[in-house]
A protein has these predicted regions:
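Phosphate/nucleotide-binding beta-alpha loop and adjacent structural elements of enzyme active sites
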Residues: 1-227
Length: 227
């Protein structure tokens, strides 16, 4: 066997081919999301009302929170760890009683960590050479749930550039999934074992929730099964 056909080379070729297939599948899902008008028809379509409670993780500039409050008059907690975007959120929603802005993210532990500042692509897990790094605060998911005062979270929205794996793993490991009626998540391909971890998380969620819509690494939504 020559070097081009060595086990290591074949393994790398196989890995590259799988990456190609996954990127192709994601592009296909993205086109379908666009055709289906997902940002208009799906992202905000939940059975919510004035008594509903929403956790918006990765609130960024507040567009998601603004839309769900306009539609449903529900209560929203916006989690945004980056100071620049938190400041903009706070100004935008000053005087809005339905929206609470919190200057921290949610994780599996309470800690400080460095995150890249790259608009809506800010992440713990990637940074361009020109990206600024900011030390931000995270709180444990159990601590964050205390904000609900024992109530269920009607919608957990996760768009946190790789942090979704940590949050959902913690929710499943601690048997907290039934605290959330709906979970909307955008998974990101920016950690080494993203494919396997997504599959494990989906298998865990399927024990208590059913899939609503599923656009591969674009957006997916899960709803708590009827009792």
């Amino acid at each position: 066997m020559n070097s081009a056909q060595s086990p290591g080379s074949l393994s790398r070729l196989h890995s590259h081919f799988l990456d190609y297939l996954r990127r192709k599948k994601q592009r296909r899902a993205g086109r379908k999301w666009g055709r289906d008008q997902g940002n208009k028809r799906l992202r905000y379509s939940y059975d919510l009302g004035p008594r509903s409670l929403v956790f918006d993780c990765g609130a960024y500039l507040g567009d998601f929170a603004s839309e769900v409050v306009e539609r449903y008059q529900c209560q929203v907690f916006c989690f945004e760890p980056l100071q620049t975007y938190f400041a903009q959120l706070s100004r935008r929603f000053a005087g809005e009683a339905k929206i609470t802005c919190l200057n921290y993210g949610i994780g599996s532990s309470s800690r400080e960590a460095k995150i890249s500042v790259e608009k809506d692509a800010s992440s713990l897990f990637r940074a361009t050479e020109s990206a600024k790094l900011e030390t931000v605060r995270f709180v444990d998911i159990n601590e964050a749930l205390q904000l609900a005062g024992g109530r269920k979270i009607d919608l957990l929205k996760l768009n946190i550039e790789g942090g979704e794996f940590e949050v959902l793993d913690a929710i499943l490991d601690r048997n907290l999934a039934t605290r959330f009626r709906h979970i909307q998540v955008q998974f990101h391909q920016i950690i080494p074992d993203f494919h396997e971890r997504r599959l494990r998380i989906r298998a865990g969620l399927a024990k208590s929730h059913q899939i609503g819509y599923d656009y591969y690494f674009i957006f997916e939504s899960w709803s708590l099964r009827p009792a």
